[in-house]
């Protein structure tokens, strides 16, 4: 029954992704017009959704208790990174692929994909836990992940902590989260019309995100996907090692059951889409990064129902 519930929860997501794929094939979305969707999600729908959901869900005391759970994703992701570091050297990967491999191994698309997937599986009560994981994921990706990918490229390596890193961490969704937290801690309510506006705009998040994933999948040639040792290692890292790391770390902390389930689903999501962007920026192996993002996206559709059955 749990497996079937997970399948049912994912069916709407699969349909929306398929719609994005089909419409792209019919010419509705071009490379230029498709750029609008992630911009709408990143700058409009996700920030407003965070403001509405957090203010709608949490009191001051409840939020302080919630935030203590961030230690679980931080520790589990650091464990996954250390394992990816060892594996990338043991597998003798090409120098321009090691950092990309590590980032795809330990960082997931915890917001762009995480919000709609967890909403489908657990409902609105899961969103605060999704955001907690997102904070840890965003900080570690834009510091350790960004630095690792920069070592792959021909350009000068990025600094582990820099002004640019801070700007990327403080993205519009993060700022929406921060504003909501400030309002919660100061116990300042927003007018009903503002909350309603945030809710309506925030409801665009899931369909726009899923349409864009369909567009992205259409743009990747399946002939470029080869199941070599490092691709298999990334799949094992994303869908076996990282979820196990979360479960092990979570067993040492008294966190709510729903929080644990959300963290497991969050870590079993596709690699960050920004992995491909950074590979291009640093002149690393962009095609390799695109393949890892695509193949982890496809495998996540299979992995998520399985984890829903056992957690």
PLM-predicted stretches and their roles:
Residues 1-311:
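Alpha-helical transmembrane segments of multi-pass small-molecule/ion transporters
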């Amino acid at each position: 029954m749990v497996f079937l519930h997970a399948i049912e929860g994912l069916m709407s997501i699969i349909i929306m992704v398929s719609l994005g794929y089909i419409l792209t094939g019919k010419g509705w979305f071009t490379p230029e017009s498709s750029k609008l969707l992630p911009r709408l999600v990143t700058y409009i729908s996700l920030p407003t959704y965070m403001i509405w959901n957090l203010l709608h869900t949490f009191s001051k005391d409840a939020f302080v208790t919630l935030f203590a759970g961030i230690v679980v994703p931080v520790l589990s992701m650091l464990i996954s990174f250390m394992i990816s570091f060892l594996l990338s050297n043991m597998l003798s990967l090409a120098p321009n692929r090691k950092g990309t491999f590590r980032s795809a191994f330990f960082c997931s698309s915890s917001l762009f994909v995480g919000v709609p997937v967890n909403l489908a599986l657990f409902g609105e009560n899961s969103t605060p836990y999704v955001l907690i994981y997102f904070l840890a994921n965003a900080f570690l990706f834009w510091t350790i992940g960004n630095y690792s990918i920069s070592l792959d490229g021909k350009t000068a390596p990025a600094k582990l902590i820099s002004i640019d890193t801070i700007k990327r961490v403080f993205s519009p969704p993060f700022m929406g989260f921060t504003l909501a937290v400030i309002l919660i801690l100061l116990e300042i309510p927003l007018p009903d019309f503002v909350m309603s506006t945030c809710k309506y705009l925030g409801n665009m998040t899931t369909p726009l995100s899923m349409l864009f994933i369909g567009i992205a999948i259409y743009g990747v040639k399946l002939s470029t996907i080869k199941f070599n040792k490092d691709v298999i290692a990334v799949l094992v890292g994303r869908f076996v090692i990282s979820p196990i790391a979360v479960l092990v770390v979570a067993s040492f902390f008294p966190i709510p059951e729903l929080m644990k389930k959300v963290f497991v689903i969050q870590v079993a999501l596709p690699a960050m889409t920004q992995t491909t962007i950074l590979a291009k920026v640093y002149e690393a192996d962009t095609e390799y990064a695109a393949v890892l993002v695509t193949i982890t996206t496809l495998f996540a559709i299979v992995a998520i129902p399985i984890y829903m059955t056992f957690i």
